[in-house]
Design a protein with these regions (language model features):
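Glycine-rich phosphate-binding loop plus the immediately following alpha-helix
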Residues: 110-117, 128, 143, 148-179, ...
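Short beta-strand-loop/turn "lid" adjacent to the catalytic site in phosphate-handling enzymes
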Residues: 60-107, 125, 133-144
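Phosphate/pyrophosphate-binding loops at sites that engage ATP/ADP/AMP, CoA/4′-phosphopantetheine
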Residues: 58-71, 169-173, 286-298
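Glycine-rich phosphate-binding loops at beta-strand->alpha-helix junctions
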Residues: 297-316
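Short glycine-rich, Thr/Ser-proximal phosphate-binding strand/loop in the N-terminal lobe
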Residues: 6-47, 207
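Conserved phosphate-binding/catalytic loops in two-lobed NTP-binding clefts
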Residues: 310, 314-340
């Protein structure tokens, strides 16, 4: 009997993953890919709310499920104010911040908004968990070269923490016992140093680090300043170059790494150079995080959708295997991790945090 139905919603930069769980048992799931031309018509992720909500509605209809059948809805957490990890109720103050348009423009802001919309009519709880703004930085990691622009902790925290726990458990350890470098490779890339249960450093995938399928990553600053001051571009146009139209999209016109591999196999040398350059930058960021951990690295974990790629993974491994063993956990643990958070919240309301 499906008496603990939980709907899980995970909006990413280029996809929306939706799943129906009965407790921790996944009953149904769908991974909807949003191609770059579809998303190009939206000036921000917030503008995609109706578009992404429709995808969730359609999934529920396909599964012959209504919100009234659910016990709870949980969405991926967005770039809110710095928070501790855990599960949060989607209440008025959290909604206000998500709807403000003042947050970092990331698809994860839609997780709580969609969850709340689904839950509202059915009068069931809506949650988020381990939002991208979980902040466990050492103070030294916050310092940039300009006092008014500190480095921020914004990352794919949910999947990183889930895969750290999984790999540690497979080795008879707890997250508090190990030092891992985790490269989350999705539409955006987060490369994190995880020391004894804390994520002490990570690149902000919107601002810096390797370029990715649709983000520009670290760019030459003087060139970027010249573009910004040229008068040719509005702010939103420049932002879209950095987040949404950058990376593989800018170079090759697609955010789909599988398509790029097909081009390479057909003899496209430009596609090979660009994809290998992306792997090169990922490896370089992993090397940087090894210095954060002072070389005391138990394992390097590659996770996310791009960790399935038959070209990218070997290119990374050949550059970083000298640091530590490389463990590949393709795909994401985020759906199950969110479902587990919701189960714990339903079982013990005292663990649910208010924003």
């Amino acid at each position: 009997m499906n008496d603990k139905l939980i709907l899980v919603i995970n909006p990413g930069s280029t996809s929306t993953k939706i799943a129906l769980f009965n407790g921790l048992e996944k009953l149904k799931d769908v991974d909807i890919t949003h191609q770059a031309p579809e998303l190009a018509g939206f000036a921000s992720n917030l503008e995609q709310l109706d578009y992404r909500y429709a995808a969730v509605e359609n999934a529920l209809k396909d599964w012959d499920c209504s919100p009234a059948d659910l016990k709870a809805v949980i969405g991926r957490g967005g770039p809110l104010k710095p928070l501790s990890g855990g599960v949060y109720h989607v209440g008025e103050s959290l909604l206000k911040d998500l709807q403000s348009g003042k947050l970092v423009d990331h698809a994860s802001i839609l997780g709580g908004l969609i969850a709340c919309r689904v839950a509202a009519d059915a009068r069931i709880p809506a949650y988020i968990a381990d939002p991208v703004s979980v902040d466990e930085f050492d103070d030294i990691a916050r310092i940039s070269g300009w006092p008014e622009l500190p480095r921020l902790s914004l990352s794919h925290t949910l999947n990183i923490k889930a895969v750290v726990a999984e790999v540690a458990a497979e080795n008879g350890k707890r997250p508090e016992d190990v030092n891992y470098i985790v490269a989350h490779l999705g539409g955006g890339f987060s490369v994190a140093a995880h020391r004894k249960g804390r994520q002490i450093d990570v690149n902000n995938a919107n601002d810096a680090g390797p370029f990715s399928p649709e983000r520009s990553g670290t760019l030459p600053l003087t060139g970027l300043l010249k573009m910004a001051c040229s008068g040719k571009y509005q702010f939103n146009e420049l932002k879209k170059m950095l987040i949404g139209k950058g990376g593989l999209v800018a170079h090759l016109g697609t955010s789909d790494c599988r398509e790029v591999v097909k081009r390479i196999e057909a003899g496209d040398e430009k596609a090979k150079l660009v994809l290998e350059a992306m792997a090169y930058q990922i490896a370089k960021e992993i090397g940087a995080m090894a210095t954060v951990l002072k070389g005391q690295v138990d394992a390097i974990i590659l996770t996310g959708g791009v960790a399935n790629n038959p070209k990218v993974v070997p290119w990374i491994k050949e550059r970083v295997e000298f640091i530590a063993p490389v463990i590949v956990k393709p795909g994401q643990n985020e759906l199950k991790a969110l479902a587990a958070h919701a189960c714990r919240a339903l079982a013990d309301a005292s663990i649910v945090k208010e924003y």
